[in-house]
Amino acid sequence: HIVDLVSLTDRQMCAYRGNKIAMVFQEPMTSLNPLRTIGYHLIVVIRRNQKVSKKEAEVLAIAELEKVGIPLMKERMRQYPHELSGGMRQRVMIAMALLAQPKLLIADEPTTALDVTIQKQIIDLLESLRQRHQMSMLFITHDLALVGEIADEVIVMRHGEIRESGAVEQVLEQPKDVYTRALLHCRPQLSTRPYRLPVTSDFMKQDENGQLIEATNLSELNLKQRSRGLTGEEAIVLEVKDLKKSFYSRKGLWGREEFQAVKGVSFQLAKGKTLGLVG
């Protein structure tokens, strides 16, 4: 039967949160209690939805942390949110949502804080769970490539209004709306290297009635390629040599354990260039 969620009280909504509807937010620090350990957060979710002991819940929580790519799971269980990186905190949020085995998962930019190597793992995990448990997923994102990979249908919105909707292949490959086409034109291409990245206003404008129409002055967009050559004579603005960085966590009453986050990293950044750092 149809349920109007807006009309429900907070107490009534408790019956739907978790096992029916779960959400992964973009910023995990707004959802995690800074006074509670990571293990506490996970165990509460498990015992709210499953009839298991605290010890059994701890085992399940550790296994879930491993699924979302968090190393040293037992140590992480004892840590607090501020002791984890932003990416680690987001993975904890994803684990909490998946533990509840919801019928509907609302994911608001869930992989934004993750590096590309973990992003693929998380997306594959979400997709496998969706199929295994017949779970529906509302995936909110600005990443068009990710939409094409994970979604069956897509809705393109602008200023709070729907501009176009339909099957993902139809919308992304044969878009009908001018705004959708402008978004797709803005995607960087490997074949060209413009002086600046194009924006939607380069490909559309408003007519006298305020309606969006295709831009006709695309020739004004400077797509001249820059030289990719690095001669070695360019000025180096940043040089890092054999950088090491470690963090320490409590172990026992007086001891502490080292976690080496950076292990002998070296690189140079030339003037006017962009260096992509993945990981």
Positions of PLM-derived features:
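Short, glycine/charged-rich "phosphate-handling" switch motifs in NTP-dependent
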Residues: E153, S165
